[in-house]
């Protein structure tokens, strides 16, 4: 009988003994619940059968556990023998590593290899295989100084140019505010025919005066502002402009433009008058002495994320 057939037969015997023991035991307990006398032949027969089935189950379980334990020990020994055989085979295949002179031979061969490797490096340095100007450079740095300078020049040429129309103070928040976008020509000059609804775009809606005034104008914008003023006057007097809301918006824009022109002219006149007055015209009439220009200047410091940083001469002053 093979090992698998014998193992299957043992499992079936164990399962049969377990089922017989459960059946006779449940029958005995049912008789007890019904109140049958323990001297009754039915109870005696049921109890005796249940006891024999229980003893048979114990014997089968002990035999099965013994067989299983022996099988486990045999498998463990077989694994040890197989491992020993595998290790012996590996050692036989690499028995040259176990030779007494292997370590000395290995060290001498390693020294010879290192010496030849250094000699190869010396030959490479002598003939200069990298094609440089006399020195062997790093093979990873294939860009020279001239190449780096040329690349930097290309990067600077492709960088976006800084606009000149910014505020005088580079740290002013107005220098970072985007300029208000102009309304499209078709939206400003759009007209409706008689009997049609004026479907003007949202870009033609009136803008707030604060948005228009916040855009700082430089002195060299006088010509452009004059051209835009004439353009606005032309569009405001055109016969096609009939919508009252759009007309009021253009009038407000025209007023803001005139106000900006007047403010720029007043600033230019004040600058010219200040330039005419010299230091010799200022006289001290007594009392508190006047402050010098250096004392009147306010140093904003160097702006950082943690606040302004002042140079060392402020601390020593």
Swiss-Prot record:
Region described as Disordered: 166-291
Principal location: virion
Keywords: Host cytoplasm, Host nucleus, Virion, Virion tegument
Localization of this protein: Virion tegument; Host cytoplasm; Host nucleus
Sequence ranges of Basic and acidic residues compositional bias: 182-195, 217-236, 249-265
Protein role: Contributes to the nuclear transport of the viral transcriptional activator VP16 during the early phase of infection. Therefore, participates indirectly in the regulation of the immediate-early gene expression. Additionally, seems to be important for efficient nuclear targeting of capsids.
Record family assignment: Belongs to the alphaherpesvirinae HHV-1 UL14 protein family.
GO cellular component: host cell cytoplasm; host cell nucleus; viral tegument
Polar residues composition bias: residue spans: 198-211
Protein's UniProt name: Tegument protein UL14 homolog
One Pfam match: Herpes_UL14
């Amino acid at each position: 009988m093979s090992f698998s057939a014998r193992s299957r037969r043992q499992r079936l015997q164990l399962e049969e003994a377990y089922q017989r023991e459960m059946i006779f035991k449940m029958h005995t307990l049912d008789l007890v619940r019904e109140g049958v006398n323990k001297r009754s032949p039915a109870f005696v027969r049921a109890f005796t059968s249940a006891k024999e089935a229980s003893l048979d189950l114990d014997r089968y379980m002990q035999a099965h556990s013994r067989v299983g334990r022996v099988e486990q020990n045999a498998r463990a020994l077989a694994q040890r023998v197989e491992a020993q055989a595998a290790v012996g085979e590996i050692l036989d295949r690499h028995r040259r590593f176990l030779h007494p002179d292997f370590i000395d031979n290995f060290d001498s061969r390693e020294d010879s290899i290192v010496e030849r490797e250094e000699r190869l490096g010396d030959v490479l340095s002598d003939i200069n295989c990298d094609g440089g100007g006399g020195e062997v450079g790093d093979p990873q740095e294939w860009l020279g100084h001239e190449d780096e300078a040329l690349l930097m020049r290309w990067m600077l040429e492709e960088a976006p140019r800084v606009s000149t129309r910014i505020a005088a103070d580079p740290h002013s928040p107005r220098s970072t505010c985007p300029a208000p976008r102009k309304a499209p020509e078709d939206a400003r000059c759009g007209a409706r025919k008689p009997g049609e609804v004026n479907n003007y775009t949202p870009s033609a809606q009136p803008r707030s005066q604060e948005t228009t005034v916040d855009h700082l104008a430089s002195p060299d914008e006088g010509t452009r502002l004059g051209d835009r003023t004439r353009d606005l006057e032309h569009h405001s007097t055109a016969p096609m402009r009939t919508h009252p809301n759009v007309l009021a918006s253009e009038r407000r824009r025209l007023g803001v433009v005139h106000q900006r022109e007047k403010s720029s002219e007043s600033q230019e006149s004040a600058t010219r008058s200040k330039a005419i007055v010299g230091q010799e015209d200022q006289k001290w009439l007594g009392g508190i002495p006047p402050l010098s220009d250096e004392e009147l200047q306010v140093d904003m410091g160097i702006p950082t994320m943690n606040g302004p940083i002042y140079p060392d001469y402020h601390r020593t002053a």
